[in-house]
């Protein structure tokens, strides 16, 4: 069953509209890393972008909770 972003992923976003922000973050990070996202891109390159998104989201959440490591 497709989710909001049209994929078949079982991951559900808890905040409406977050998909657009995550997509923007994905393309910004890909640009920083020099990765051209797409079907021809290696799993390793795509994974590096996803991993960086996760790191930044965790860091942001930690800062919001007041216990963030800078």
Swiss-Prot record:
Residue spans crossing the bilayer: none
Record keywords: DNA-binding, Sporulation
Domain of life: Bacteria
Gene3D superfamilies documented for this protein: Small, acid-soluble spore protein, alpha/beta type-like
Family matches, as PROSITE patterns: SASP_1, SASP_2
Protein family membership: Belongs to the alpha/beta-type SASP family.
Gene Ontology molecular function: double-stranded DNA binding
Protein name: Small, acid-soluble spore protein 1
Gene: sasP-1
Stated role: SASP are bound to spore DNA. They are double-stranded DNA-binding proteins that cause DNA to change to an a-like conformation. They protect the DNA backbone from chemical and enzymatic cleavage and are thus involved in dormant spore's high resistance to UV light.
GO biological process, one term: DNA topological change
Miscellaneous comment in the UniProt entry for this protein: SASP are degraded in the first minutes of spore germination and provide amino acids for both new protein synthesis and metabolism.
Site (Cleavage): 28-29
């Amino acid at each position: 069953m497709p989710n909001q972003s049209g994929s078949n992923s079982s991951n559900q976003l808890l905040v409406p509209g977050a998909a657009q922000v995550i997509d923007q973050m994905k393309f910004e990070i890909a640009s920083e890393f020099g990765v051209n996202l797409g079907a021809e891109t290696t799993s390793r390159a795509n994974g590096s972008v996803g991993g960086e998104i996760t790191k930044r989201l965790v860091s942001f959440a930690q800062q919001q909770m007041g216990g963030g490591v800078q």
